[in-house]
Amino acid sequence: MNHFAKIAEKLNTYGLDGMLLTCEANRFYASGFHSTGTDGVALVTREGNFYFTDSRYIEAAHNKVQNAEIAQTDAAHPYVDLINAAMEKTHVQKLGFEDAYMTVADYRHYSEKLHCELVPATELLISLRQSKDAEEVERMIAAQRIAEGALDQILKEIKPGVTEKEIAARLQYLMLAGGAENMSFDPIVAS
């Protein structure tokens, strides 16, 4: 599941040549690749897509990310250099960024180092992510079934003497063992 093409189709509507994705959730939406925290940047353009990450995730990115060029960032090749090279290759002059998620420090850094005009464009992603395609609906149903199965099992295991922490840990284990990729949030167990 990746949505590079959907994002690229919306660029003209917003007057953009490309879209910079730094937020983990939006990188996942675009690429289908789940990395941790701030470890990655995706660039979507009409002429091609790019995914940049560090050495910890480069092999996994090569295996998971499709329809994008993958490159590794390091001290000699910082994100801004990789982004600038990709923008030059794809003729990006107006670059959308996630203004609702990007820190002021990151914005200042990108605005000083990138050779383009940065344009606030979180709305582009919000409008796309609001509607789900058939594959996303199927995944949501599968996730619900995994959660329900784990809940059914954990209800049988709750008894006096079992702590909330133990129940939460067991519930998380049951969901992962049942096929969940990750938790959206830590389980909340209260008595």
Regions of interest found by a model, annotated:
Residues 1-50, 80-81, 88-91, 112, ...:
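Terminal domain-start leader segments
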Residues 22-24, 53-55, 74, 97-102:
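Structural motif
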Residues 25, 57, 124:
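A generic "binding-loop/recognition-motif" signal
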Residues 26-28, 59, 103:
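Glycine-rich nucleotide phosphate-binding loop and flanking beta-alpha elements
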Residues 30-32, 61, 106-108:
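Short glycine-/acidic-enriched loop or helix-start segments at secondary-structure transitions
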Residues 47, 52-81, 85:
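Compact, glycine/acidic-enriched structural inserts
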Residues 78-183:
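Flexible, acidic/His-enriched mid-domain "rim/lid" segments that flank
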Residues 182-191:
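Acidic, glycine-rich loop-and-beta core segments that form the ion-binding/anion-interacting portion
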